[in-house]
Regions:
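The two-metal-ion catalytic cores of nucleic-acid processing enzymes
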Residues: 1-200, 204-280
Length: 280
């Protein structure tokens, strides 16, 4: 309609992202059943590679149960200093998914908790980040403020040890993009910062004025974070590592809350994706 106006000489669609324009042109709705014709090709990839000659939507069935993996990190942060990814290591890493839970930590202590796994160093912990994602094969990797904190922090620490975070399905590295706001992308795996979605999309309908994990989980899940003092973590790490177990439980519980929030929000996210026509 607009291009028929006398005052409009041309429309270039520069403001429409390429992916969005492709879906519009092909009449494709993300997360619904499609049929493709073409051939499989030999290419280094964690998933089969198919060169499609044509793609068409053949049904309205929706992928409602994607494989979700949540993660969270704890860092060494002296209480009187600002967070510094260049200097301060990651000391714990947790994952939570369906029938899967794990905490990696690189100081040893006595524990009977089966999901705690000890590694020898921070670099080994970062390798476990890469290996766990590769082995679990999530459709969606989710974190809470993971665009703004967790993934950029992990990338900075990985760069320090010259570790390639080649977790993309095409073996490409995780990409941290800083423009108006920091975003992280992984080829072939959807990265969902559930904090961003909740704050931007449903935040105005919530009662809380704070969007920290505890407040949001309390309102949406009727669950809360574990009650531990993170101010003590640095001292415990340095001097009393026999007391680290409760912080590992805390770390895993944050991943559990993040997982539950993502699963709860997924039906809303999926319907929005179908309406707007842009992948998650």
């Amino acid at each position: 309609v607009i291009k028929e106006w006398e005052s409009i000489s041309s429309i270039h669609e520069f403001d429409i992202p390429f992916v969005r324009r492709y879906f519009i042109d092909k009449n494709m709705v993300p997360l619904t059943l499609h049929q493709a014709t073409g051939e499989f090709v030999s290419q280094k990839s964690r998933a089969a590679v198919f060169r499609a000659d044509s793609i068409e939507q053949v049904g309205s069935d929706t992928l409602y149960n994607p494989r979700v993996l949540a993660f969270d990190i704890e860092t060494y942060s002296p209480f009187d200093l600002t967070i510094d990814a260049e200097k301060n290591p990651i000391i714990m890493l947790s994952f939570y998914g369906e029938n899967f839970k794990k905490v990696f930590v690189w100081k040893r202590f006595k524990t009977a908790i089966g999901y705690i796994e000890f590694v020898d160093s921070e670099s080994d912990l970062i390798e476990k980040f890469r290996e766990t994602i590769d082995n679990y094969k999530p459709d969606i990797l989710t974190g809470y403020f993971s665009d703004g904190f967790d993934l950029p922090y992990i990338k900075t620490r990985a760069d320090k040890y010259k570790i390639k975070l080649d977790i993309g399905l095409d073996f490409s590295e995780l990409r941290v993009k800083s423009a108006r706001e920091t975003t992280v992308a992984i080829n072939g795996i959807t990265h969902l910062d559930i904090f961003k979605f909740i704050k931007k999309i449903i935040g105005t309908t919530m009662e809380t004025y704070s969007y920290d994990l505890n407040a949001v989980a309390s309102e949406l899940l009727d669950e809360k974070k574990h009650d531990v003092s993170l101010a003590e973590l640095t001292d415990v790490w340095d001097n009393r590592h026999e007391n680290l177990e409760k912080f590992c439980e805390y770390n895993l519980h944050d991943s559990l809350l993040t997982f539950n929030l993502a699963v709860k929000m997924l039906p809303t996210i999926i319907e929005m994706v179908k309406i707007v026509g842009i992948p998650i």
